[in-house]
Structures are given as C-alpha cells and as structure tokens.
From Swiss-Prot:
Pfam families given in the database record: Corona_NS12-7
The organism's place on the tree of life at top rank: Viruses
InterPro entries tied to this protein: Corona_NS2 (IPR006841)
Family per similarity comment: Belongs to the coronaviruses ns12.7 protein family.
Organism for this UniProt entry: Porcine hemagglutinating encephalomyelitis virus (strain IAF-404) (HEV)
Protein name stated in the entry: Non-structural protein of 12.7 kDa
Length: 109
C-alpha cells in the first residue's frame, strides 16, 4: 500500500461539531487559534481501515513577546467512518493533550 497523509491543499476547514471547545482551551492556555481540517481518505491508503474520514489539526504556540512568531508544538490526526465522529475524536485528543501539557509544565515552572 502507498503511504498517504492529509495534504493542506485538499483539506476543508470546519468550526462545527465540538471545535468551539478546542477554541476555548487554546485561548485559555495561549495557543494560536485552531484550524481543524478534514478530508476523505482514499481507498488505496494504508489507513483506510481506520475510517473513511480524516480530521487533522496542528497545535501552534505563541512566543512570550507576542511578536506573531508561532512555533509548531505537535499535530493530531483522527480517523473515523463519519466526519462528525472524526472531528469529535480529534477535539477530545487535542483538549486532553493541551490540559495535560499545561499541568505538566506548571509542575516544573
């Protein structure tokens, strides 16, 4: 099977489903405004058995000086057979990671 990953030029973006929860968490912990993208997974892709829809999101952090420099922290990808389920799964994973990261960083600093 061919290697496949979602490409930006084929993504559509949404703020529906549960994305507002992700927006709130990103604002609370000072991350860049989230853009959740989704696309259909092609039949030939290795990950097709995970689901026919793919949702993706890249988490960017802001610098302390607010000089519009955004660095990539991590990326998330979720698969499911329905678009709503894929986006909801992605939002759940991202919110969980952001809250875990904030708690872990507060322990050390």
């Amino acid at each position: 099977m061919d290697i496949w990953c979602p490409e930006k030029k084929y993504l559509r973006y949404t703020n529906g489903f549960n994305v507002s929860e992700l927006e709130d968490v990103c604002f609370k912990y000072n991350y860049q405004f989230p853009k959740v993208g989704y696309c259909r997974v092609p039949n030939y892709a290795w990950c097709r058995n995970q689901g026919s829809f793919c949702a993706t999101f890249t988490l960017y952090g802001k610098s302390k000086h607010y000089d519009n420099y955004f660095g990539i922290i991590t990326g998330f990808t979720a698969f499911s057979n329905s678009l709503e389920e894929a986006v909801n799964k992605l939002v759940f994973l991202a919110v969980d990671f952001i809250t875990w990261r904030s708690q872990s960083l507060n322990v050390y600093g």
